[in-house]
Amino acid sequence: MPAVGDDFPTPHNTEKSADSPMPPDEVCRTAKLPPGFELAVFAAEPDVQNPIAITFDERGRLWVAENFTYAGANAGWFDANLRDRVIILEDADGDGRHDKRTVFWDQGRKLTSVEVGFGGVFVLCPPQLLFIPDTNRDDIPDGPPQVLLNGFAEGVVGHNIANGLKWGPDGWLYGRHGIQETSLIGPPAATESQRAKINTGIWRYHPVHRKVEAVMHGMTNSWGFDYDQHGEMFCINTVIGHLWHVVPGARTERMYGIDFNPHAYQLIKQCADHVHWDTGELWHQVQKGISSTTDAAGGGHAHSGLLIYQGDNWPKEYRHKAYTLNMHGRRINCDRIEPYLAGFVAKHEPDFAHFADPWFRGIDLIAGPDGGVYIADWSDTGECHDHDGVHRTSGRIYKLTYGKPTPTQRVDLRAMPLLDLADLLASGNTWLKRAASLELSYRMQEAKSPLPSDLLSFEVANGGEQNLVHVIRMTMNLAAQESRSLPQEFCDELVQMAQNDPAGLTCLYLAAALQQMEVDHRWTLAEQLAARKEFSDDRMFPIMLWLGIESAVTQSPHKAVALAQLSHIPLLTQNLARRLTLEIERDPKTVTKLLDVAIGTECAHPHEIILGMSHALNGWRKAPAPANWSQAAQKFSASDLTEVKQAVQQLSIVFGDGVALDTLSQLATNGGAQPEARRQALRALLASKPTGFAATLHGLLGDRAVAVEVLRGLALYDDPSTPEKILAALGIYPPDARAEAVNTLATRPEYARALL
């Protein structure tokens, strides 16, 4: 199949409205901007239509992914009769408006993103990540696309589809994934165990080592990320919060569903201290219009695109701030990112720009070679899901500048000598810096030059927080590229860092590094980090520390008990107790030792042990009582903390006569309770198979948090209405629940007939 064909289907509009978008020049005239800023039309229909993603190449040309196959929520999401394409827009004379348009490839379907580098073009067309080689750079593909990865969910996925290719400062190609479905991503020949599993969050791919991995799990449907001058990545999101700091191994809050790790007891909240909508409203109310309170807060919860401006065109007071396109509010929100404890906090700044065009649907924004910001406008009337059809024949790229920037001299980084490229790494022009870094990575790969062995020396520019963080990140990246754990000598250096470095960000990355260490090597570093009580209230550090040690707990329970005793991080103490108590039937002696620590005088947070035990056994009907429970109960019943007294009462029941079935049923059906406690309550109830419980289970079929247990329980009850009710809810289930639904429907001939 040719890269560009004469048979490209003519895009047609399904938009129900008879209105038309505001003329592009009028959009620029009516936009409300800060003093001194100008908005200009870089390109507009028919030269660009439905721009879903934009990027620049090493020559400063704008590449645009045009998506025509998207059909909206009421048309099956995608139209198989159409195709998508990648075009190149070039401003040869530097006047701020494109004067050359080239169609590079028009064979795409479900195209969501484009990125250029390493001798070709990367395009994301779920279920595949494709690479289109163009080594001679003649803008004609050298051959058919190569499938680098497959397994991206796309069958039932609409607006939450995988998206967002962007080069990271580490040479990896990053992408995003929405919440509607779970993907198993890997090279075409990879087995299931060799694939990266992701449901919602951030993933990345290494173009040389051909390795893919999940970076961060959580959020809702991220459609934008960028990184600051130090390489710290941030991503944008919708509904539940809008800005997260991306740290490898993090697990964040999510709109719905359950994290893959059942022992991720707490999920990380956003780093912004505010939201852009009135949370007293339901999230979907904005579809009917923006209330005055949501307008004042920022325009709505739906965001697309993220730019941390680091160019040299905008005045200094606008630099190093985060800018995102607010979908419903038709504006650019602005947040100020500041260091806070072990990470960052984002503070609300006045909205940067407002667009009067009712059709304005900003979807991406990036800085260009001259420091101007390019904004991709989908140009349509629908909101996030396009219930009213798609207007495929409109689309714009605007350019936002301070004044009229001096036309940049045309550049071609591929033609530059190596030393000149290296000089650009210190440039104040971030576009040049990033493009030079990518070009250097490509040349290193072409020359097959290994990274110098002393790259990770700890004598880095006289130390300093950002330098140490950079060293940790680089070493983690190298280990990930080679699919190995961190070397022991480096782990020893990490322990020294934890002892001697006062910086919170260093500690945060040390906690992240735990997940890449051999399990047996994690304890010494964890002990040092557990002493950093000044970061116990940080929104990320305690959780990252727990996630780093969690998988080692049951392998070395005696070390876990010792860590609980010396920990000055309350959440860590609680989670250690919680995880150990879950093993009470298999390993009751360890729980007794844990209580000895709580009863003793050397534990900094003994009440957290009781709370952790209570969380662990919430939903249990009965558990064996530790030998020293009466002594512990006597001590903590006298606590001044109400929640500790309540925990003692609950544990005494579980360790005594057991919890009543009615109490378990109330917990199981309480949608506001902890998901794992509800699941455990269902398991305990179903073990006794209470009479008439099928009706209760039917009422829970739409509850994703307990779907597996509910479906498994329905197999115990013969009820003729069960098949119909299961099949009606099947579309909302993740893969494990769908598999359980099939198992249940296969338990009886009449159920199986309904399935068939």
Name each model feature, range by range.
Residues 2-421, 431-442:
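Beta-propeller domains with acidic blade repeats across secreted/periplasmic ectodomains
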Residues 376, 393, 400-756:
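Long, ordered, helix-rich scaffold segments
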